[in-house]
Amino acid sequence: MNGSLTKAQAGVGLPAVRHHNAALVLDLLREAGTEGISRLELAERTGLTPQAVSKITARLRAEGLAVGAGLRPSTGGKPRTVLRLVPDAQFAVGLHLDRDGLTAVLVDLAGRSVAVTTAPLDFGAPAERVLGAASDAVRDLRAAEPHKPVLGVGVAVPGPLDHRDGVLHRVTGFPQWDGFPLRDALAGRTGLPVTVDKDTNAAALTVSLSEPCGDFAYLHLGTGLGAGLVLGGEVHRGARTGAGEFGHQTLQLDGPLCECGGRGCIEALCLAAEARGDRAEAARVLGAGAANLVGLLDIDRVVLGGRTVAADEDAYVRGVRAVIAERAARGAGGAHVTVAVADGGDRPVAEGAAQLVLAPVFGRVGERG
């Protein structure tokens, strides 16, 4: 937040939205960090009455989510009591189930990863084995804070999938997952609420929460290639969570066969160039796809991530930036677009999975259909 709330964010004094108002207050406490924020500032920022803010903060303190953080001088009156969030009052688990590895994080209310585990994973193994690895990771992370509540588990996996029902569709290279109810199956194993989304959407959520970015595309190149889109400040999933299947856009009609059954997909061309050791070509291909997105969506920024990008960040940034600049020089737009790399390698995916659980706590549930 940056000082004022949009109409959708502003507090509304109706009983039916008490949770919404509490979420607004919690989000401002989170944003204030260790310095804290006064009740008067909370009322000014949310549009709620001072009385409503006092009731909400009293409840948050009783629940252990907020504590006093000292006094702050005021002009002409008595010092104001400052409140701050208690980050370790509650946690969320984030899981990134990749094609060949599992990353799991325990994230506190401030968004900090307090425990991280990684392990090999064969996403092509029987579902029971994959579920066992995922539930074991959740158990191990909960042991790091055994006496603190875990709100739920966010799971980020390759698409396509239906995030509303938590059901996987025909993941490229892994057709056995088609129709599998991952959300319900893992909830049954862990006893916790589970939210499922695409890995690229989870990473895009992490980027969008870390800094104001405007409209951007997050391009994840690892063992596969996909995109997460943030438009109007919200993760854009599409009507059926189909947005962002970027890797299987056709770039060369007579190109090499892709695992999806098509030819000349951006993913196939990128990974083939990497396999040949031609990283400059891989970056150029990724840049061509990125430039298409820039022209189609008029976005402000392209953010790159994934282990393949992390192996040579400079090469990928240069290559993608060069293609976008070349298109812009021909009048195709994109002169304003910046290209950057997401921090943390593959970690933003797992951390974004945890944010799928935490974001609603703070009223940050942006989603486009």
Where are these regions (language model features)?
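Short, acidic, Ser/Thr-enriched surface-loop or helix-capping motifs
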Residues: 108, 163, 230
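Glycine/GP-enriched mid-protein hinge/lid loop-to-helix segment characteristic of carbohydrate kinases
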Residues: 116-118, 125-130, 177-279
